[in-house]
Amino acid sequence: FPQGIMAQLARTAAAGQPGILSHVGLGTFIDPRVSGGKLNEVSQEDLIRVMNVDGKEWLYYPVVPLDVCLIRATTADTEGYASMEEEITYIDVLQLAQAVHNNGGTVILQVKRLVKAGTLHPKSVKIPGFLVDAIVVEEKQEQLYNGSDRFFSGDYIADDSAVTMLPLDQRKVVARRALMEVRPGYVGNVGVGIADGIGNVAREEGVQDAFTLTVETGPVGGATAQGIFFGATVNARAVMDMPAQFDFYDG
């Protein structure tokens, strides 16, 4: 299933709904009239269906019941209420926890530290404790394979002196050409690959404030991280839940 559909399906499953009707995937390899997302001939069952509602075609994606989820936050109190202050994004951890809990499954939460019950600021809590079945404390919890990055988590702001000039190669030329298509006031989605350099080139040119770049994982604004760190953003203006981010894209 497409990334956004999977994120939205977690929310749909949590609500006890059967599936999602979406225009996403029509006419692509996800469309059952093409290949239905099947990788090879071993997969025979059509999981996705074409449906007509009021004369318009939609793809129907059924909910896949979830039994277990392993999610990560930064701090949890002894009753399982958890905050995510050192995480890069919230992605769909809340929706997954709700979906698994409401399906009678097991929600396992990994955190860096444990604090006394009721001491977390309520607006910082992203996962309510009644959804959590088990807590694992890992004090050396690393955000990335090379350790946490407080710029990615939004604790630090990078000024212009921190901007690294990208080498003038094919990737930069393509990113610069793509930047030329962006108009003031645009809101864009930056995908993985060469597109991850657009934000950096915009900062080099001093035009980063003329438009807003977003990433599927939730960041809004700022400059996207590149390569294996893609999905993170430096100087993000906001961080959305991933299902909400895709709601905006799809609409």
Regions found by a protein language model. Name each.
Residues 1-251:
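Conserved alpha/beta enzyme-core scaffold
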